[in-house]
C-alpha cells in the first residue's frame, strides 16, 4: 500500500504518524484484521467479509476517507495505491520503503534518553492489548519499530489528547533499571490500573509489557547465561525451544513476563538495551538475517562500550545452532563475554 500525500502541507515528521494509524483504520473494518508495521504487515480478510463483497480496493477507500477525516488540517488531498504484483511490491519495498525507513531512523542518532526532558506514551495497540502501554524514549522506540520518540512527539503536538501523551521524568526511583515515578503513574493510568510499575532498561525486573505488534522478541537463555532474539520474519526454531509464534503467545497480551520482552529491531543496538543486566553483551543468538540487519550499529555500540571488535561474529545464528548445547559450544569457541557474566536468574 502506498499513500501519496502533498509535500507542501504534509511534513516529514507527520508522515510516520499517519502511516502508523493504518493499523487502527484497517482494524475498524468488520471482518478484517491487521497486525505489524512498516514493511512487515499482515492483513487477514474473513470469508464472511469476502462473501459480503469486501475487496482490496475497499481498504484503499477506508484509508483515503480516514486520513482525509482525521488529518484534514494538513491533508487536503491524497491518493492510495495498492500493489498486488509480487515483483512490483519487491521493487517498491527496496527502492522506496526501506530507504525511507532508514532516513527516519537516522534522525535519532544524536538523541539520548538523558538529553530530553520528557518521554511519551503510545497506546495505539490497545485495541488488541488493553493493558499494554509503550513508553517511547529517544533510545527505546516503540516495540512495533514504527513509533520513534520524534514520531510520538509529532503525534502529541498534532493531538495532545491522542494516543501519545507526554511523560515527565523528574522523579527517578532506580536509574539502574530505568524506573521513574512519573512513568509508573502514567502507565498505571493508561493501563486502567492493570500495570503499576515498569522499567525501561531491564528484562528481569518489571519489564515493559508487549502487545502483538513487536518486531522482535528477546528471551533469556539460561544455558549460555545470555538472551536469544527472534524477529517476526524468522520461521525456524530458536535455542529457547520455541518459534517466534510460540514466543509471541507467552510474551504479548499486555502482561509483564520477566525474562521475555518484545522490542523494535533498532533497540538491539542501543546502549540502553537490557542495560540493567549488562547490556548487549548478553546477546548470544539471533537469526542470520536479523544479525546482518543490525550488525553495523551493534558492532559500533559494542566497540564503544566494551572495546569489542566485530561483536556480531561472536553471536550465534540458525546456521550454527538451534539448540542450547550446540550454542554453548559455539560461544565457548568464540570467547563470548556472556559466559563469564553473573547469572541472570
Question: Model regions: which residues?
Answer:
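Cysteine-centered metal-binding/redox modules
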Residues: 1-345
Amino acid at each position: 500500500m502506498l499513500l501519496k500525500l502533498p509535500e507542501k502541507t504534509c511534513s516529514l515528521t507527520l508522515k510516520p504518524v499517519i502511516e502508523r494509524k493504518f493499523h487502527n483504520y484497517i482494524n475498524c473494518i468488520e471482518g478484517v484484521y491487521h497486525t505489524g508495521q512498516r514493511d512487515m504487515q499482515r492483513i487477514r480478510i474473513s470469508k464472511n467479509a469476502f462473501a459480503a463483497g469486501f475487496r482490496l480496493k475497499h481498504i484503499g477507500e477506508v484509508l483515503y476517507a480516514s486520513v482525509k477525516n482525521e488529518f484534514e488540517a494538513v491533508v487536503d488531498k491524497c491518493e492510495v495505491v495498492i500493489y498486488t504484483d509480487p515483483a512490483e511490491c519487491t521493487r517498491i519495498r527496496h527502492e522506496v520503503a526501506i530507504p525511507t525507513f532508514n532516513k527516519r531512523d537516522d534522525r535519532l542518532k544524536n538523541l539520548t534518553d538523558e538529553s530530553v526532558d520528557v518521554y511519551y506514551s503510545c497506546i495505539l495497540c490497545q485495541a488488541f492489548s488493553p493493558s499494554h502501554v509503550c513508553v517511547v524514549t529517544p533510545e527505546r522506540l516503540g516495540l512495533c519499530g514504527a513509533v520513534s520518540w520524534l514520531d510520538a512527539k509529532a503525534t502529541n503536538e498534532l493531538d495532545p489528547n491522542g494516543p501519545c501523551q507526554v511523560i515527565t521524568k523528574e522523579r527517578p526511583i532506580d536509574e539502574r533499571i530505568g524506573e521513574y515515578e512519573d512513568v509508573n503513574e502514567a502507565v498505571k493510568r493508561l493501563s486502567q490500573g492493570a500495570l503499576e510499575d515498569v522499567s525501561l532498561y531491564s528484562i528481569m525486573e518489571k519489564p515493559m509489557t508487549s502487545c502483538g505488534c513487536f518486531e522482535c522478541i528477546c528471551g533469556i537463555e539460561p544455558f549460555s547465561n545470555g538472551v536469544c532474539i527472534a524477529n517476526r520474519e524468522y520461521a525456524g526454531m530458536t535455542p529457547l525451544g520455541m518459534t517466534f509464534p510460540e514466543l509471541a503467545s507467552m510474551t504479548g497480551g499486555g502482561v509483564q513476563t520477566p525474562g521475555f520482552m518484545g522490542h523494535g529491531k533498532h533497540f538491539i543496538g542501543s546502549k540502553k538495551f537490557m542495560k540493567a543486566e549488562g547490556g548487549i553483551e548478553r546477546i548470544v543468538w539471533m537469526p542470520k538475517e536479523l544479525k546482518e540487519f543490525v550488525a553495523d550499529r551493534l558492532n559500533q555500540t559494542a566497540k564503544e562500550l566494551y572495546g569489542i571488535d566485530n561483536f556480531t561474529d561472536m553471536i550465534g545464528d540458525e546456521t550454527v545452532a538451534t539448540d542450547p548445547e550446540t550454542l554453548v559450544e559455539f560461544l565457548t569457541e568464540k570467547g563470548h563475554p556472556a559466559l563469564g557474566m553473573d547469572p541472570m536468574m
